[in-house]
Amino acid sequence: MVKIIGLDPGISKTGWAIISLNEKNNIEFLGGGTISTDGKLGTGERLHIIFEQLKKVISLYSPNEAAVEKIFVNKNPKSSLTLGYARGVVILALKITKLTMNEYDANYVKKSITGNGHADKDQIIFMVKQIVKNLNIKCHHAADALAVAICHAYTKGSCFVE
């Protein structure tokens, strides 16, 4: 059985989701959530929280593969820089836990899930609920991470759209 962790990095909220694929390539949602940090904390403390919490998630679920959403350059350079810090911590956690990272552009993820590279958050949540039955997910960060994991399954040929 293949287990994939999908990640949507962010300094305030890092979304994560774990899926498994059985021998028939059916997707099962194993867990997901958001690692949140307090904006009142210093950057170093926030990054440490992301790192430690992500290591716990990886240890708990033992995924075989990892998929991370690439960052885009924002109009606000400071926001782009702090997003890059969060992404760096995610990459480090994956490296330390010996998971190979696969990266996907946000537009590619959206297109593979919804058919539209410019889909909004509600469309993504709607489609992941169509793909993964009996899913109760409300947070868009976790839904984005789930979309990244599903995109990876589709892209790597582990699974195909029916």
Curated annotation (Swiss-Prot):
Pfam families: RuvC
GO MF annotation: an example: DNA binding
KW Protein biosynthesis (keyword) present: no
Cofactors that this protein relies on: Mg(2+)
GO biological process: DNA recombination; DNA repair
Known EC number: 3.1.21.10
Binding site for Mg(2+) 2: 69
Subcellular location: Cytoplasm
Keywords, ordered alphabetically: Cytoplasm, DNA damage, DNA recombination, DNA repair, DNA-binding, Endonuclease, Hydrolase, Magnesium, Metal-binding, Nuclease
Positions contributing to Mg(2+) 1 binding: 8, 141
Keyword Hydrolase: yes
Subunit structure: Homodimer which binds Holliday junction (HJ) DNA. The HJ becomes 2-fold symmetrical on binding to RuvC with unstacked arms; it has a different conformation from HJ DNA in complex with RuvA. In the full resolvosome a probable DNA-RuvA(4)-RuvB(12)-RuvC(2) complex forms which resolves the HJ.
NCBIfam families given in the database record: ruvC
Task of the protein: The RuvA-RuvB-RuvC complex processes Holliday junction (HJ) DNA during genetic recombination and DNA repair. Endonuclease that resolves HJ intermediates. Cleaves cruciform DNA by making single-stranded nicks across the HJ at symmetrical positions within the homologous arms, yielding a 5'-phosphate and a 3'-hydroxyl group; requires a central core of homology in the junction. The consensus cleavage sequence is 5'-(A/T)TT(C/G)-3'. Cleavage occurs on the 3'-side of the TT dinucleotide at the point of strand exchange.
Family to which the UniProt record says this protein belongs: Belongs to the RuvC family.
Protein's name in the database: Crossover junction endodeoxyribonuclease RuvC
